[in-house]
């Protein structure tokens, strides 16, 4: 499905945190747009909200199950306003969607710089005691520190790079070997 085609009806089954400008742009993509401001309580509520919509938007707080989708045969597209890394980690039944010709997309690689900035700033606060008691009696630098990173995806890789920039020794755990990380 080309998501630039016009939909009949777009339903955001829960708050999806769109800025007002982009919420307005949704109206150019469908004849009708319905945005719910609360989190649905179960599959029946979700199915009722979707109704005859052909486009569904959701965030990370609700699950779009096979049971709910089966009650809504018009669904052609599900937009996850959150991360989609794998069918196993998704809050949408990706396998059901694929088997029924429903296109599902999510967001990848967003906010990574902010995550890295937060991790580095909190580590510096902890090591130096800025605004809180210091980790040890004497402030420490990141240089020479042994840092472990769990998960070497986009954010984890950027955190490892930032720590390496400051002179830390990096160790990581990931589901598979990361040759690029080993070479750094």
Annotate each language-model stretch with its function.
Residues 138-184:
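Rossmann-like dinucleotide/phosphate-binding beta-alpha-beta segment
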Residues 7, 75, 143-146:
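Phosphate-coordination loops involved in phosphoryl transfer and adenosine-cofactor binding
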Residues 26, 48-49, 68-71, 141:
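Structural alpha-helical scaffold elements that stabilize or flank donor/cofactor-binding regions
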Residues 43-46, 65-68, 138:
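Acidic, amphipathic alpha-helical patches
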């Amino acid at each position: 499905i080309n998501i630039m085609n016009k939909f009949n009806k777009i339903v955001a089954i829960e708050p999806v945190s769109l800025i007002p400008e982009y919420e307005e742009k949704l109206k150019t993509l469908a004849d009708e747009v319905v945005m719910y401001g609360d989190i649905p309580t179960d599959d029946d509520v979700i199915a009722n909200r979707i109704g005859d919509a052909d486009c569904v938007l959701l965030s990370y707080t609700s699950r779009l199950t096979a049971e709910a989708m089966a009650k809504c045969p018009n669904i052609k597209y599900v937009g996850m306003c959150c991360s989609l890394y794998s069918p196993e980690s998704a809050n949408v039944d990706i396998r059901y969607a694929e088997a029924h010709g429903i296109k599902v997309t999510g967001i990848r690689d967003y906010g990574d710089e902010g995550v890295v900035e937060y991790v580095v700033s909190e580590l510096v606060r902890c090591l130096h005691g800025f605004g809180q008691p210091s980790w040890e009696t004497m402030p420490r630098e990141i240089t020479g520190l042994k840092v472990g990173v769990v998960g070497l995806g986009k954010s984890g890789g950027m955190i490892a790079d930032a720590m390496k920039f400051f002179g830390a020794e990096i160790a990581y755990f990931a589901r598979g070997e990361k040759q690029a990380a080993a070479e750094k």
